Swiss-Prot record:
Localization per Swiss-Prot or TrEMBL: Cell inner membrane
TM segment ranges: 14-34
A single MF term (Gene Ontology): unfolded protein binding
Protein name stated in the entry: Lipase chaperone
Organism: Burkholderia cenocepacia (strain ATCC BAA-245 / DSM 16553 / LMG 16656 / NCTC 13227 / J2315 / CF5610)
Disulfide bond sites: none
Gene: lifO
Length: 344
């Protein structure tokens, strides 16, 4: 279970953009064809909250010119599209949270006020002059309130994942905060995620129950799995196959298998198409690692040149754009840069 529900998509992006190697990208290659299943004005809207939101929006719009640049961490990328329903209102969809999580990726580059202004601009770029624009701004303020409330929890909500009691408390706390701050947006934002976490918790309780025999545990786990909706059960089966394949890839690499030998073995297990995708991803990953190493060496030279922080960051951003020209590459490089910086 994620320590912060609001951070989950950011963790997913870090796994995609970071240098996690073949095992992780193999999962992307194998299941890239599988569709994702995602779920005006939230229930219990308070006039005071709407008024505060309106003031904040007006201030942000007045303070930031339309020509303000994209944060370095998002250079070369674009925000997800905000969905609308048939009436032109903001659709209650998980995609709205994905949009805000995309914007939140820039938190390391921006102050809180600048981040608000950036979100205002991104919303206006898609919804300017529509009723959905005000709705999106309201949901953004609610989501920020949710994240702020999570941050007040002990250890920012971090919990021992092996302790069912602590996990249960954490789930209940997050669900309560989500409903209090997001109203009926809590279901599209976190409903599927919370269901999955409660399912995982139920599995953990069964596996840790010392009063059960192995046969009884297996029986209860099978019964629990049957409670899953059909699409969730299919998704879980895909995850299980993915994990098994990733374990197999790791073992093949550990044993020193050649690329051809790995492909032959994976073809037997996954089929020729998936094996070919894994092989291509391996080549792409090797190319990426080489280019990032060259870029990192040039970045280090810039960092050692004694430039002002503004000039240094500008030169590094320009270098990143020159080296990484494919969609998403510059964002991935920026994510790795931040990870390297936090490690020192």
């Amino acid at each position: 279970m994620a320590a912060r529900e609001g951070r989950a998509p950011l963790v997913r992006r870090a796994a995609i953009y970071g240098g996690v190697g073949l095992a992780a990208v193999a999962g992307v290659a194998m299941w890239s064809g599988a569709g994702s299943h995602r779920g005006t004005g939230a229930a219990g809207d308070a006039p005071e909250a709407a008024a505060v939101g309106g003031v904040a929006v007006a201030a942000s719009q007045a303070a930031v010119p339309a020509s303000a640049g994209v944060p370095p961490s998002l250079a070369g990328s674009s925000a997800p599209r905000l969905p609308l329903d048939a009436g032109g209102h903001l659709a209650k969809s998980r995609t709205v949270r994905d949009f805000f999580d995309y914007c939140l990726t820039a938190r390391s580059d921006l102050s809180a006020a600048a981040l608000d202004a950036f979100v205002v601009r991104e919303i206006a770029a898609q919804l300017d002059g529509t009723v959905a624009q005000a709705e999106a701004l309201d949901v953004w303020h609610r989501y920020r309130a949710y994240l702020d409330a999570l941050a007040t929890l002990r250890d920012a909500g971090a919990v021992d994942k092996s302790d069912p009691g602590a996990l249960q408390l954490a789930l209940d706390q997050r669900a309560s905060i989500a409903y209090r701050t997001l109203g009926d947006w809590s279901q599209p934002f976190f409903g599927a995620e919370q269901w999955r976490q409660r399912y995982d918790l139920a599995r953990l309780k069964i596996t840790q129950d010392r009063s059960l025999t192995d046969a009884q545990k297996a029986e209860r786990l099978a019964a629990l799995e049957q409670q899953m909706p059909a699409d969730e059960r299919e998704a879980q089966q895909r995850v299980d196959r993915q994990r098994a394949a990733i374990d197999q890839i790791a073992q093949l690499r550990k044993s020193g298998a050649t690329p051809d030998a790995m492909r032959a073995q994976l073809t037997q297990t996954l089929g020729p198409e998936a094996a070919a995708r894994v092989a291509q991803m391996q080549q792409d990953d090797a190319s990426w690692q080489s280019r990032y190493a060259d870029y990192a060496a040039q970045r280090t030279q810039i960092e050692s040149a004694g430039l002002s922080p503004q000039d240094r960051d500008a030169q590094i951003a320009a270098l990143r754009q020159r080296v990484f020209t494919k969609p998403g590459e510059a964002v991935r490089a920026a994510s790795l840069d931040r990870g390297a910086g936090s490690a020192h």
